[in-house]
């Protein structure tokens, strides 16, 4: 593998001149520049990314720490982030944590060693350990992409889960539903709890109370939606509608409903959350709460690039508002 010394020798110049040509850190005569570039091409020389970053103070790379890249919601955001990074000439290092503090620590240390220009963080929950870890890397520009901790060292983008939960509850109430269940991820998780609180607000505005037997907790997985729905179907008294904490739980719930010989929305109305790509292809197409994954990813990167350019600027909190997407999984009881 060729070195910078080999390039300098072939071009008949100093290693300093070669460095200036590569990093564009000083004017070099056009003829000399051409000779150096020809030598680089002949030797197939590739400068060390780390060495170059020490010269120009950028690696043109971003780190992204997520709970998991398998879940459809995370996967769609990651795709949007990677696409925007590519268009801006940046590379993306993706790190999955499964909310394991040890993994978060190792990933943060690895990203710091690779001298990434900044880090995006998107975890479904933040433990005390992970918050402390993030504070210890506060010299790195960092944007938290979900509900996020209140941290003066990071910018935040809020997804307004409370507002989304309210929109879901209100849509069901407006369609004449009074007996409504909530299939939730663990309520200790902020996202699930905020969606539930917004949902309760819509019920209370309509003078309705939540039946505690119809509040079932699982996780953000289709298996949990399936199992929770089966527990609901086993009860003597059943709701007319089900609000699911996310779309994949809703798909699991619909599977349980159809297995038992019931139909959506004729027998049970179902509404999801996130508007992941597959939700429009369920049977029937799923009514859901839309969060623009492309807008979230692009806005997070814009904010991170701003922070990379100016590390001393005041930290920002930006809100992204969810929207109701009406398809065919909710029955209007007012017409019957």
From Swiss-Prot:
Pathway in which this enzyme or protein is active: Purine metabolism; purine nucleotide biosynthesis [regulation]
| Superkingdom per UniProt | Bacteria
Q: Where does the HTH lacI-type domain start and stop, copy by copy? A: 2-56
UniProt cross-references to Gene3D superfamilies, sorted A to Z: 3.40.50.2300, lambda repressor-like DNA-binding domains (1.10.260.40)
User: InterPro entries in the record, alphabetically?
Assistant: HTH_LacI, Lambda_DNA-bd_dom_sf, Peripla_BP/Lac1_sug-bd_dom, Peripla_BP_I, Tscrpt_reg_HTH_PurR
Among Pfam families, the record links this protein to: LacI (PF00356), Peripla_BP_1 (PF00532)
A GO molecular-function descriptor: transcription cis-regulatory region binding
Biological process (GO) annotations held by this record are: negative regulation of DNA-templated transcription; purine nucleotide biosynthetic process
- Keyword annotations for this protein? DNA-binding, Purine biosynthesis, Repressor, Transcription, Transcription regulation
Binding annotation for hypoxanthine: 73, 189, 191, 220, 274
Q: Which residues bind DNA?
A: 4-23, 48-56
The entry's free-text remark on domains says: Consists of two structural and functional domains: an N-terminal DNA-binding domain, approximately the first 60 residues, and a larger C-terminal domain, approximately 280 residues, which imparts the function of corepressor binding and oligomerization.
Subunit structure, per the record? Homodimer.
Q: What does this protein do?
A: Is the main repressor of the genes involved in the de novo synthesis of purine nucleotides, regulating purB, purC, purEK, purF, purHD, purL, purMN and guaBA expression. PurR is allosterically activated to bind its cognate DNA by binding the purine corepressors, hypoxanthine or guanine, thereby effecting transcription repression.
Designated name of the protein: HTH-type transcriptional repressor PurR
